[in-house]
Design a protein with these regions (language model features):
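Core recognition of P-loop NTPase motor domains used across DNA-transaction enzymes
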Residues: 2-75, 87, 130, 138-141, ...
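Conserved inter-motif catalytic segment of the P-loop NTP-binding fold
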Residues: 46, 56, 64-65, 69-70, ...
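Conserved RecA-like P-loop NTPase ATPase core
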Residues: 74, 97, 118, 177, ...
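Pre-Walker A (Motif I) flank of P-loop NTPase domains
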Residues: 75-79, 114
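Phosphate-binding/switch region of NTP-binding enzymes
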Residues: 80-82, 86, 90-91, 119, ...
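Hydrophobic positions on the alpha1 helix immediately C-terminal to the Walker A/P-loop
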Residues: 92, 96
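Post-Walker A helix-loop "phosphate-sensing" segment adjacent to the P-loop in P-loop NTPases
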Residues: 99-113, 347
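DNA transaction DNA-binding modules
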Residues: 272-374
Length: 374
């Protein structure tokens, strides 16, 4: 494996600590009403008030793709990043934030550029300046913002983040460092229910806006056979999250760390990293196993060949689409269902957005090439 990380590294500009909220967001942000990643059952009137969808409805619906922030590593949703105090979490957060803001590969992983907000709630601006200038030099990037104070989850954090998203609709990643700083004071009253509730609230927000919330947290002192059992608190934190990263060292003074990764939208991984003490960045040393990739899908391959930068769009009926797909011999209704359930892969692997809607004249399919480099 090779290290694709580029070496030209600008620094970061500093944003204000707080943003004003508004009753209505008027930007092009797609909210929960039409871009909720989680399954939204259609409301039905019945005696029991349970909203359901049939398997037929499930297959006939196109759900928006879950966008990668870092391919095979980090996606939209809510993730935990957990490690012991002073293990190097904040250096990793700064490194990740910079790479996403600049769109530079993180080691061998492709990164999708976007605005980043880093809530460095255990730091001050002077410390951030020293750390970041040592890591990235003094050239600036306008896509990376910092705040050292924020409200708690129950006291208006969501309004603050909404205000930032309103001003920066291309935001892709928000880092909260640390979870404890945005929790209500609970002491020993924390429970599975309260742990699950706070992450669920954060996840609801990230799903509503299609962004990634990466929440930094600490491990507990007690060792465990399963590294994910070392997350401080109860299993409610991991149970509600979309995934988690656990950073561990054998000894605090070691330069080498293991990064265990688990998630709903990416394969489980164990990476070996080495800390460069001169530049204060984490370097990739290797992975325990190579990532398993789905084999090519002949249908998606045929669809991808239809579009090009010169002809980035196509729309028509499913029957017309079948006529364009040489070598594909299935019924039109089966074609649309296969594309419905493959919309996520079609977007993330081929850069093609797939839409399907029914009009008074029948069903219409639209294909749009949004990223020819996918």
């Amino acid at each position: 494996m090779t290290d694709n990380r580029k070496t030209t590294v600008p620094g970061a500009s500093v944003g204000a600590d707080a943003v004003q909220s508004s009753d209505k967001i008027t930007t092009n942000i797609i909210t929960n009403s039409d871009k909720q990643i989680n399954l939204q059952a259609a409301k039905k009137s019945n005696n029991f008030g349970l909203n359901t969808v049939s398997m037929t409805e499930l297959y006939d619906t196109v759900y928006p793709p879950r966008r990668p922030i870092v391919n095979d590593l980090l996606y939209s949703g809510t993730y935990l990043f957990v490690g012991a105090p002073k293990v190097g979490k904040s250096f990793f957060m700064g490194q990740l934030a910079y790479h996403v803001a600049m769109g530079l590969p993180l080691w061998e992983y492709e990164v999708h550029q976007g605005t980043v907000l880093y809530l460095a709630l255990e730091d001050d601006y002077a410390r951030l300046q020293r750390r970041l200038s040592r890591m990235f030099g003094v050239e600036e990037t306008s896509n990376l913002y910092f705040a050292t104070q924020a409200k708690s989850v129950s006291k208006g954090l969501d309004q603050q983040l909404e205000g930032f998203i309103r001003e920066h609709p291309d935001v892709r990643l928000i880092i909260i460092d640390t979870l404890q700083k945005v929790r209500e004071i609970g002491g020993d009253r924390y429970s599975y229910a309260s742990d699950y509730e706070i992450v669920t609230k954060l996840k609801t927000f990230s799903d509503r806006y299609g962004i990634c919330l990466l929440v930094v947290h600490h491990t507990r002192k007690m060792e465990a056979e399963d590294s994910f059992d070392m997350i401080s608190g109860t299993n409610g934190l991991l149970g509600a999250a979309d995934g988690a990263f656990i950073m561990q060292k054998k000894r605090r003074t070691d330069n080498t760390a293991l990064l265990d990764i688990v998630g709903r939208d990416q394969p489980d991984q164990e990476l070996t990293l080495e800390f460069d003490r001169e530049r204060c960045v984490w370097e990739f040393q290797g992975a325990e196993t190579e990532l398993w990739k789905l084999p090519p899908d002949p249908l998606l391959e045929a669809v991808a060949k239809m579009l090009s930068p010169e002809q980035p769009e196509w729309s028509g009926t499913p029957t017309e689409l079948l006529e364009r797909l040489s070598g594909v011999s299935i019924q039109a209704n089966i074609l649309t269902r296969k594309l419905n359930v493959s919309a996520d892969r079609l977007y993330n692997d081929y850069g093609i957005r797939y839409e399907s809607k029914r009009t008074h004249e029948g069903r219409v399919v639209k294909l749009t090439l949004e990223n020819s480099g996918a």
